[in-house]
Amino acid sequence: MLIIRWLAYRAVMPEEELFKSEAEQSRAEIAAALVEAAEQIETGTIQLANESTEQDVSIPETPRFETELERLTDSETGEERYELEYEIRWTR
């Protein structure tokens, strides 16, 4: 399953998590999920699904798109963890 995080963002409103999916997958599986997501985004509607819920999301013609790479370092062990995030954001 693909992790896609989306927000109907308002500056003064608290964040409400509407959907989350997370699983270890191969690079090939992740790439296939991203291709599928890209095709759905291009149509303007994306279907999010996991084992317990399903949700359709309409994406406007010109949302904001953010790419972020983070490195988090454990202060005790020095172990580094990386997070690559793609985020689509818009207001309604």
What are these regions (language model features)?
Residues 38, 57, 76-78:
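Generic marker of residues within folded, mature protein domains
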Residues 21, 42-72:
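Short, structured protein-protein interaction patches enriched in aromatics and acidic/basic residues
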Residues 69-92:
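C-terminal edge-of-domain segments
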Residues 4, 8-9, 60, 83-90:
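Intrinsic, low-complexity terminal and presequence regions
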Residues 30, 35-41, 45-52, 80-88:
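Short, low-complexity, charged amphipathic interaction modules
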Residues 2-37, 43:
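Terminal, regulation- and interaction-focused segments at domain boundaries
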